[in-house]
């Protein structure tokens, strides 16, 4: 099974890359994590936010293919670590690859949210893009540590 973090944005600061690598390298081969960067669409020539979101959504869906699609959205479902671990167990049992999508500066287009298998909210707060990548990487590792009864997560 492969986990893809599909993220609109590129040229992240070194600390983001370093932190994400720290967590993704801890993941076992059978749950490999790949970070796919989608170049943000520019708001040039009078493009509004919806047009930008729509163009980005098309590229995101191409990158995700037939994966189980998780869209990170502030209006999505908030879960505990144990609930996330249960979700991850389900993903593992299904055998499908999973794409987790982080939107760009304008967020995700409604069409992508409707196609998502799950809308997940890491927080109701607005966070910097790089911070979301790091938090997502850490939470995926934490969820797997719960599944494997590893002492990283403590209740």
Swiss-Prot record:
Pfam families, alphabetized: SPOUT_MTase (PF02590)
EC class: transferase
Major location category of this protein: cytoplasm
A GO MF term: rRNA (pseudouridine-N3-)-methyltransferase activity
Subcellular location: Cytoplasm
GO cellular component: cytoplasm
Domain of life: Bacteria
Keywords: Cytoplasm, Methyltransferase, rRNA processing, S-adenosyl-L-methionine, Transferase
Gene3D superfamilies found in the cross-reference section: 3.40.1280.10
Family: Belongs to the RNA methyltransferase RlmH family.
Entry protein name: Ribosomal RNA large subunit methyltransferase H
Encoding gene (name): rlmH
């Amino acid at each position: 099974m492969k986990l893809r973090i599909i993220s609109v944005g590129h040229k992240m600061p070194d600390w983001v890359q370093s932190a994400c690598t720290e967590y993704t390298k801890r993941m076992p081969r059978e749950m490999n994590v790949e970070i796919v960067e989608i170049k943000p669409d520019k708001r040039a020539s009078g493009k509004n936010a919806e047009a930008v979101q729509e163009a980005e959504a098309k590229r995101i869906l191409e990158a995700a293919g037939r994966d189980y699609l998780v869209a990170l959205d502030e209006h999505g479902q908030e879960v505990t670590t144990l609930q996330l671990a249960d979700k991850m167990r389900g993903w593992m049992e299904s055998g499908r690859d999973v794409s987790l999508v982080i939107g760009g500066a304008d967020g995700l287009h409604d069409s992508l949210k409707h196609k998502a298998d799950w809308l997940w909210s890491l927080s109701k707060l607005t966070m910097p893009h790089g911070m979301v990548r790091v938090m997502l990487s850490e939470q995926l590792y934490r969820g797997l540590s719960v599944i494997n009864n590893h002492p990283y997560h403590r209740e």
